[in-house]
Amino acid sequence: MTADSPLPSVYSLFDLHSHSQASDGLLSPEALVLRAVEQRVTVLAITDHDSTDGVQPAREAIARHQLPLQLIAGVEISSLWENHEIHIVGLGVDIAHPALTAFLAEQAERRLARARLMAERLEKALIPGALEGALALAAGGAVGRGHFARFLIAQGKAANMQQVFKNYLARGKTGYAPPQWCTIKQAVDVIQQSGGRAVLAHPARYGLSAKWLKRLLAHFAEQGGEAMEVAQCQQAPNERSQLAQYARDYGLAASQGSDFHQPCPWIELGKKLWLPGGVEAVWQRFPDILQ
């Protein structure tokens, strides 16, 4: 957002979690911002997995098309806590900050090492060519399980993403390799060093019991985490209100985001994104993410 861009109004629609081809999204950064405007999103954060490569092309596309869209530079960092992969979104980061660029280069090496191990395990299961296939689908972006999933579907090994993860890529399955990510503290620190705000992504998606989710939230807050996602497109009944209560309990600001990866009927940019009463929105507590 430029210095003379207007601040969002009360009627703004924020989507603070989305992915482009810079990681495992299907749309280019240009197509992503165009779709966001079509869906009446007015403030969009591009938060690719361990990559900020989609941000500058998106900025250029917004300027070229003169889109009525404010872009927040973001990233979604993969971390490890108690043997669970936990994602930390950074909002309002300086994508050129040396600490962030060096950190993301390390994450890219970890990603590639994991991809090689996944491919080795799939090859032992008589599924050759997985690494080459996944890297081709990543097209220079951050390679991840989503690319392996698309490769396996194209090979006829599964009908859809849910099935391919269940049969091949979930923990304990043939193509799963344990991640060697950074700690939550390291993720929070580098986000803040680069001028951003640290947000716990999709807290209800980690398969944690209520007791363990509270432990995660307490740990995240203790490590300097500042906000948590409360609203998403797809949520179980009462999940949003429960997450809002957790945000209040742990002193965290509330964020919202679709976690959009590709066009599909149930997850769409800006869809069903609203915050319950009694929480403080991350853009209200930390207006610097809009600058």
Q: Can you say where each PLM-predicted feature lies in the sequence?
A:
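Extended substrate/RNA-proximal surfaces in nucleic-acid metabolism proteins
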Residues: T2, A61-A218, G278-E280
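An N-terminally biased module of ancient metal coordination in phosphate/nucleic-acid-related enzymes
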Residues: M1-H84, Y168-A170, T183-D189, S194-P265, ...
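Catalytic core of soluble alpha/beta enzymes
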Residues: S258-Q291
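Alpha-helix initiation/capping motif
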Residues: S20, H97, G144, A236, ...
